[in-house]
């Protein structure tokens, strides 16, 4: 991570050196001025430069999180990311299901990636920690500190959600989504969007808990598909499987099929999740 004082000073100096050019090229290739449309600044120039410098510093920190996390996560592939609620208690059936699934995935040769916190995240790490492959936690620093669970062979701390979510997607060959709240839904739809738009290759997105997910899936079919906002093929991106052994079979079948394309794709680790 870059030294904060040095990085901020560098960003501040860079901000002071920038001279704003109000002329831009429009879609017709003509040079146009934005001055007539730009609002009058509400803050003094010095204050705005300081804010810009701090924003530049945050960009540097985000880049450093990408680089550092990427280097560490290369060693743990292939991996499966498991999403789910931080509030699920240890005696809940979803916790116990996740614990068993993660252990089986770990013994089958897949590292297991979770958010590193309590609840479903803890169950995923705990199951993998007892198995043959690494348990990985992608921990996030929050205003109300998320306590990292103790079942992590590799623990990576993030200040920003953006690089953390990318690491969940980039370094996994499949995504298992347990019941959860806003954070889980965010991770689910992030994965769906990246696969749907081709920004990441097709990988299994497996929902666990028919009773929990059926209402959302019905709404997606009725409102999104029914209004033509998604294609019928987009529904095939989601699998609903409540049996842990069938989940592993689904992941293995997809992973082995992907390995057959290794010769065609060469060293494209993003495409293969390797």
Regions flagged by a language model, labelled:
Residues 159-211, 255-260:
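Active-site/ligand-binding-proximal alpha/beta "capping" segment
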Residues 119-177:
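Acidic/glycine-enriched connector segments
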Residues 141-147, 184, 212-215:
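Short gly/pro/ser/thr-enriched loop/turn and capping motifs at secondary-structure boundaries
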């Amino acid at each position: 991570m870059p030294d904060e004082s040095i990085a901020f000073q560098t960003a501040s100096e860079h901000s002071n050196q920038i001279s704003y050019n109000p002329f831009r090229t429009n879609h017709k290739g003509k040079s146009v001025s934005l001055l007539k449309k730009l609002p009058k600044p509400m803050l003094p120039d010095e204050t705005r430069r300081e804010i810009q410098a701090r924003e530049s510093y945050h960009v540097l920190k985000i880049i450093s999180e990408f680089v550092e996390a990427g280097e560490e996560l290369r060693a743990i592939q292939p991996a499966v990311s498991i999403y789910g609620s931080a509030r699920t208690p240890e005696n809940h059936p979803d916790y116990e299901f996740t614990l068993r699934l993660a252990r089986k995935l770990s013994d089958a040769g897949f590292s297991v990636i979770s958010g590193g916190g309590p609840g479903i995240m803890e169950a995923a790490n705990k199951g993998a920690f007892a198995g043959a492959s690494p348990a990985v936690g992608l921990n996030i620093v929050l205003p109300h500190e998320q306590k990292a669970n103790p079942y992590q062979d590799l623990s990576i701390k993030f200040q920003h959600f953006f690089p953390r979510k990318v690491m969940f997607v980039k370094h996994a060959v499949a995504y298992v989504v347990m019941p959860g709240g806003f954070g889980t839904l965010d991770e689910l739809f992030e994965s769906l969007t990246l696969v749907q738009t081709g920004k990441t290759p097709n990988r299994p997105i497996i929902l666990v808990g028919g009773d929990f997910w059926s209402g959302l899936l019905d709404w997606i079919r009725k409102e999104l598909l029914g209004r033509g906002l998604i294609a019928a093929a987009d529904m095939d991106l989601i699998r609903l499987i409540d049996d842990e052994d069938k989940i592993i079979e689904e992941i293995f079948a997809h992973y082995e099929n992907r390995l057959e394309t290794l010769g065609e794709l060469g060293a494209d680790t993003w495409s293969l999740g390797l």
